[in-house]
């Protein structure tokens, strides 16, 4: 059975992985814009001496970012699997967690309300019980 600290660690690592993925996606989009400014096709771009070198450099950076993004997304899937294990271990306490995860699709909502800081598992479980009674 997972301890409270282990749950906290996994949820924090998911949040960090998500932030990294967003950063990498932003960098990839910036690179795309740098490679091909909007409205201009690459064949229409003026050929300057370093054109091929520049494109090769951008392609290399793009590929590296793509690989980093894949690794981060793999990490997210691993942590989601652990979140599902938590649900199996403590289904009543995890009910709100699961609902928030499905409907908001925001991991921040899970982390802030449930495990990072202030609220204990007991408060969380108590809220779940109250919600089931309604």
Q: Would you name each region that the model predicts?
A:
Residues 121-132:
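DNA major-groove recognition helices of helix-turn-helix
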Residues 88-103:
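Short amphipathic alpha helix immediately N-terminal
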